[in-house]
């Protein structure tokens, strides 16, 4: 490859702001950057004395540079983020975080439902959040259900009940589905209390409850007064647990940051309306020799500009690490329509939370490094046990079904950092005889390997959860496709052995040779890990498919029972479970249901 002619290239570069993309000889984007002054920034790559080892390595691979001029720095920042997201360049810091952020959702209904929501905000209603993870949302919902027991059931369940459910009996739902238990006004008031609570207006809620308690007491309704008193006490306990301080009543993100030995961790403490919603650790993928400031600023840009994941921009971002924040501050201010500030090393309560975030970042990084070392050591042990020069990628397949029903196959992927969950796949198996595991394995492998694979996606080992029969079938399929592969994977079956005990697995080669490893072998532990991941991934997929089928009411398959009669049956008897318990006489009392049809319905439900 002829060297890149930087002098000729720089003659045509402008001094305006913009974004540049660097390509290697294979026309792959290897780096994306932005600049206030494109000419000045790009010239810096071709100086004789480049201090950064990473930049030196990057420059040796440049074959072409494309430039996009923008009107403002903010436009350049957003375009840079979009290009990084699109191309995932080798020399950029990459935020490995493709999960959407969950919200608490209150539906737009006569009797609103409260639930967890992920993804696009299409439903009509109110969204509160986002929360850093689903665990934080579940904790909040559990708490809300204790304080303000509004319904969490699906609208279809709500519409088909006329008896209170178990949640009402244990005091976790006000049962708006049943007339006469709670008035529309009282239910609406509890819903409004939730809105205020989620907005951080706890004192307003407590003040309103205190007034109600005093009113009930003056009216000599002591039972109601005692119920409200208990609700107030619960609210005050929650305040003690969640309250930060008046000075932190803004929306804050507190970021702890640490980097050691090529690993970085940013720990996010999310505070909204003066309450800690939760925290989360991020481990961006960083090229070797990357400067600390580039790691941190790249993370912030990718994290806050990634609108598709449902993130919100806080009023203030607090950090202990100093970096050039002016451009990002300006971009976030323009995007959010309000002033966004980055604050360095504050005092008081904010300082205490910053110290906590830094401590958590260090702790999470240490844990990650230890885990990475353990996985690496297991890979090395496995290479030695199987006499392989290097293992970069492994895939494992498993099949799950119940008596041949809803067969699902799974494929899980491991590399030298452990499970690569973003590459896990499930395959719904169709067109085979129920229970034919050999045919199921053949189908999933055909679907997996019949397509053209990138070199780095070709596994070094393919594990099959099964014995000789499964392994031979797998070999017959895979060998049809590996003709043009630069390497051929080792195929291994994982048989459970005679006793079927964990730690006594038998490994099977395609030659028919069987061998085992000591139960305390790190190599065996790695094999067990990938096998268990594949097994669990297949089972969870199968259960979801099976539940989907069984959730479809048996009533849909009974001749003579159309949508109107189905709705009448469910409404009159209070749901499918109550209908299953009902006698023929009770079923025949439903409007439009004759005795003969009632008998047919009961028979069908017993068989279902």
From Swiss-Prot:
Interacts with UvrB in an incision complex. Its main location: cytoplasm. One of its GO terms (cellular component) is excinuclease repair complex. The keyword DNA damage applies. GO terms for biological process: nucleotide-excision repair; SOS response. It comes from the Bacteria. The UvrABC repair system catalyzes the recognition and processing of DNA lesions. UvrC both incises the 5' and 3' sides of the lesion. The N-terminal half is responsible for the 3' incision and the C-terminal half is responsible for the 5' incision. This is UvrABC system protein C. The lineage of its organism: Bacteria, Pseudomonadati, Pseudomonadota, Gammaproteobacteria, Vibrionales. InterPro entries: GIY-YIG_endonuc (IPR000305), GIY-YIG_endonuc_sf (IPR035901), GIY-YIG_UvrC_Cho (IPR047296), Hlx-hairpin-Hlx_DNA-bd_motif (IPR003583), RuvA_2-like (IPR010994), UVR_dom (IPR001943), UVR_dom_sf (IPR036876), UvrABC_protein_C (IPR050066). Residues 203-238 form the UVR domain. Residues 15-93 form the GIY-YIG domain. GO terms for molecular function: DNA binding; excinuclease ABC activity. PROSITE patterns: GIY_YIG, UVR, UVRC. Belongs to the UvrC family. The keyword Flavoprotein does not apply. Coiled coil: none annotated.
